[in-house]
């Protein structure tokens, strides 16, 4: 990998929406992890290889097979953990959107949903790789406690717990809400974004949210979109 390039790993990658956005912003993907075969097939067809419409993953390592992977199974293999450690200093960003059903106000919203633990698998990858930046995207419900007045005292939201876990790993952390409709998407889609910046990097996680605010007008004008809607 050439020095100075922005490189990323996409976890819970789905069919590649985040991967495509990173590619269009000039990032170089290392690899993506997705367990669903149909979603991974879509990602691979569109984003992996020189014959794909978008060659978003030019540096896919040999030790990661180009196939669906369950994150728990992936991290259970010593060769994968060794491979991740070998990427230290080569990865700018570890990003992902873990399954959101347990956090979603539009769904069951269940604090005991077994999928809720998957955000900690992303943190495990962060610990192994030590990227400069970590990013978690999820529904707004991840920023809210599951119980407003639990019997055993106040409980932080999962987003707050992730920020604390990032701090324990040596990262500055913050979370906020981004609404895609403010950037021209014809849909009110509020998403929670959790950002971690490694302590030795001269930047603050809050800079991400300030930058989003600062570039909004320029972005809308560039694409010929109205600035006063929605």
Predicted features by range, described:
Residues 38-42, 118:
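Conserved short alpha-helix immediately C-terminal to the canonical SAM/SAH-binding motif I
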Residues 77-91, 103-230:
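Class I S-adenosyl-L-methionine
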Residues 16-20:
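Glycine-rich SAM-binding Motif I of class I
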Residues 7-9:
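Conserved beta-strand elements of the Class I
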């Amino acid at each position: 990998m050439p020095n100075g390039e922005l490189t990323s790993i996409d976890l819970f990658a789905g069919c590649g929406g985040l991967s495509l956005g990173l590619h269009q912003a000039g990032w170089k993907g290392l690899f993506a992890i997705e367990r669903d075969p149909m979603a991974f097939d879509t990602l691979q067809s569109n984003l992996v290889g020189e014959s794909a419409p978008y060659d978003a993953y030019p540096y896919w390592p040999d030790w990661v097979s180009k196939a669906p992977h369950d994150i728990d199974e992936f991290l259970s293999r010593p060769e994968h953990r060794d491979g991740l450690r070998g990427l230290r200093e080569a990865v700018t960003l570890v990003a992902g959107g873990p399954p959101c059903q347990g956090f979603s106000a539009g769904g069951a919203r269940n604090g005991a949903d077994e999928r809720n633990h998957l955000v900690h698998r992303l943190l495990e990858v962060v610990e192994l790789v030590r990227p400069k930046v970590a990013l978690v995207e999820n529904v707004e419900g991840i920023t809210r406690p599951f119980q407003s007045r639990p019997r055993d005292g106040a409980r932080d939201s999962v987003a707050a717990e992730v920020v604390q876990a990032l701090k324990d790993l040596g990262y500055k952390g913050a979370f906020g809400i981004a609404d895609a409709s403010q950037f021209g998407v014809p849909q009110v889609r509020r998403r929670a974004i959790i950002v971690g910046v490694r302590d030795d990097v001269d930047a603050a996680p809050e800079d991400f949210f300030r930058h989003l605010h600062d570039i909004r007008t320029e972005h809308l004008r560039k694409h010929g979109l109205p600035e006063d809607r929605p």
